[in-house]
Amino acid sequence: MILPNKTILAVHWFAGWILIGTFCGCSGDSAPGGNPTAGKSDSSQKTITVGLLPKKKGISFFTSCAEGAQEAADDLGNVELVYDGPTEGEPSKAAELVSQWALQGFDVIAVSADDAQIMGAAMKKAQDKGVLTISWDSDVPADSRSFFVNQATPQQIGFKLVDVLAEEIGKSGEVAIVSSSQTSNNQNMWIMHMKERLKDYPDMKVVAIEYPGEDQDRCLETGRTLLKAYPDLKGIWAISTVALPGVAEAIRQSGKSGEVSVTGVCTPTPMKSYVEDGTVKSIVLWDTRDLGYLTIQTAAALARGLIKPGDKTLKAGRLGEREIVGDNVMLGDILIFTKENIDKYNF
């Protein structure tokens, strides 16, 4: 089960008494978490504690990732998963949580970073305390983690987003981008590659890039503002999982469903009504449960010394063998949700 922080404190207190018993001549394994020998394969049977930190709790994307993460922990059988994070998308509070977990002696901390620099600094401090660190969904500087669990390359995502909207609007017209925060590494990388891909569509003109943060109400208001400011707007990319439902609602309320296209990234369940009424034709994503699942498989393999820099593949439970490209553990294929297939997915 996913444990709250107070439970983990109790687990580590108990582990400390076991360690004392070992020094007194009793047999037993060394206490888990936060020690310099973490990652050796001779500890493959001990329970490891993994902290999974999203950009923001309460968003369907990250809730689905957490469900997949718990599935992986259950499959592995000796992983205690702690899922927690800020409720307002505040990087400083996320960094504080990383520090708390490091002090509690977690074995691995896995972070989706809303601010790569702030989170990277916190993860380096955790490393100094003997904690193994990885990132997932949104990366941090490479020197502050061992691996990045990557849903797809930023180029693949950026190119796909552009191609989908270009097809919907006839490859011409005014378009806008609604992202999350200006410090969000994954969205910034997608935008960079979107601009690159847009060179293939010279008749599409980006008139605005907005950053309302991880707040759906603010995304709704941003959508309304764009529709008023740019009456000739043909399409919008809403590239966070709160931006897409927010902007879609703005288009629906304005009566412009079918007139202004919107696509982006979101889990399918919150978007079904918008797809069914034609406000949204296509959604670009990946299986978020699988992303959470792969993150915990990666964390466990790292803690047990089963992967190391330079490896090319990872055995990842029900996902089979996953490719490692450099220090990126790759999830795989991008999914496109449409009216024809969205009811097949329930996350």
What are these regions (language model features)?
Residues C24-F347:
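A residue-level marker of the well-folded mature domains of exported/periplasmic proteins
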Residues A10-G25:
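Bacterial N-terminal signal peptides
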Residues T7, G16, P54-K55:
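Short linear sequence motifs
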Residues M1-I8:
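N-terminal secretory signal peptides that target proteins for export/translocation
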